[in-house]
Amino acid sequence: MCETPIGCHTPRRCNRFIDSAALIDCTNKTNQREHSPSFSIEIPTTPSRKRTLASSHFQTPTKRIKYELGELQEEKTDLYPNFPAQLKENKKPKLPTTPQTPKTPKRTIQIVTPKSLNRTCNPVPFATRLLQSTPHRQLFPPTPSTPSTPSYNSTAKLSLRKSYRSAGVVGRENEKSIVESFFRQHLDANAGGALYVSGAPGTGKTVLLHNVLDHVVSDYPKVNVCYINCMTINEPKAIFEKIHSKIVKEEILENEDHHINFQCELESHFTQSANELYNPVIIVLDEMDHLIAREQQVLYTLFEWPSRPTSRLILVGIANALDMTDRFLPRLRTKHITPKLLSFTPYTAQEISTIIKARLKTAATTSEKNNPFTPIKSISEVSDDSINVVSQHADETPFIHPAAIELCARKVAASSGDLRKALDICRHAIELAEREWKAQHDNTLSSVDIPRASIAHVVRATSAMSQSASARLKNLGLQQKAILCTLVVCEKTSLSVADVFEKYSSLCLRDRLIYPLTSSEFCDVANSLETLAIIRLRTKQRNGKPQDRIISLLVPEMDVITAVGDIGTLKRFFDRR
């Protein structure tokens, strides 16, 4: 058996032996250990470059620099014992460095902007800061505005708004008695119950419920009333969290199934055995049809709670659909827990006329008490003829001619019976009459010569309300179009009036082409847009502030963009910056 001796090596392994003497010594020791004869085969290989230890470590530029700096001597003496002694003792002299030309110091000039002496460090509120402009960039000086005195017709226009709550309900006496008896019957018996109120839009459902609840709360102070508009809820399951926050008012840790936790907490609260532990609860869910889902489990749960034996929950649902319980909730009839149904029919022409006249007379009484225009006369200056004139005018309908009210009521009753539309027409007619009066006279109104809206004003207001959206947008003013452009830029459906005013002010001050309105002027312009059925203003709570009302567009966004297409000032509202 022939073994390859260690001396026989391949070209790749030959580099492992640094010294030839070490290679011969290793071969001799192997031959002495093995007594059998051996021979070696020499294979021609490529001769490798001979590298000396000193040159291999000091000929490269990098390591030469290390040697010059004196660092290599300390690093290599421990690794290589045979390091030359001369290199340990002697150091090469440092190479002379090229002298550098000294740099001339540059001259720096510091520019300091002078500070204004009138600058104060007091914090400015954000709403005030929006309406302030930079002095050196102001394109036009703000014109000082004279405080405007509220007109005599402002009370009348306020009474014709949709959010106005009158002292009594006109034209719904039968429905009011049914709702009052329902509440009193269940509150006296300490039992739960369910009521479903249906009817077309503008038939007085929400107004009547608010009026009845005010009397119920005054007669039963311990009752807890919870009113929720379901249009403010993103998904049907979120109704449990909304009710829990208003009734139980206890915090629950949120997790993936936090809606189920709120539901279980409410169910245990409404169905506990000891009825004395909690007061009766009345829950009013306006726009209840927004809770309709695929399986309707949320609605079934809500209507099942009042039917429990120990429940003291009174549930009232309000929606437009007349047959919502029969079409979407058929299992309620199977379980014999069908709620009490109450349907509101559309208003007749006589009812609409009666409601408008009652509101205008109430507004006239309020205006006479707070009227700043009526001059105070002494008793000697008042004649018998003036007393007869005052008594004669007291019997007439103020602000609008009775024939004009009848015309408006008949037109609305023939089309839809929506009271809100009739109120908008009458308010717009008063604005038209007031505008004509100010154009012809010295821009003042007096209680002696109040311009009553005539039939011509009602006809013009009706035609303006019945126009297409594009035609109505075309006739708007610059500030009205600016507010609509702001709504399009916001790209959200649930914004309050305060949020839209903040965005509107920032857009006007960004381009400095339109001077923004004040907060009160902004609300007036928004109310005029609501009169033209271009936007919708609705309150989130019963006693909400005007700035907290939710504002939304009733016309397509493309119609707004088309209406402002030829106005370059408003086009910049859509620029992204």
From Swiss-Prot:
GO MF terms, alphabetically ordered: ATP binding; ATP hydrolysis activity; DNA replication origin binding
Source species of the chain: Schizosaccharomyces pombe (strain 972 / ATCC 24843)
Pfam families the UniProt entry points to: AAA_16, AAA_lid_10, Cdc6_C
Modifications after synthesis and translation: Ubiquitinated by pop1 and pop2 and targeted to the 26S proteasome for degradation.
Name of the featured protein: Cell division control protein 18
Biological-process GO terms, alphabetical: cell division; DNA replication initiation; MCM complex loading; mitotic DNA replication checkpoint signaling; mitotic pre-replicative complex assembly; positive regulation of DNA replication initiation; regulation of protein localization to chromatin
Domain of life: Eukaryota
Effect of T134A: Enhanced rereplication in orc2 mutant lacking four cdc2 phosphorylation sites
Gene: cdc18
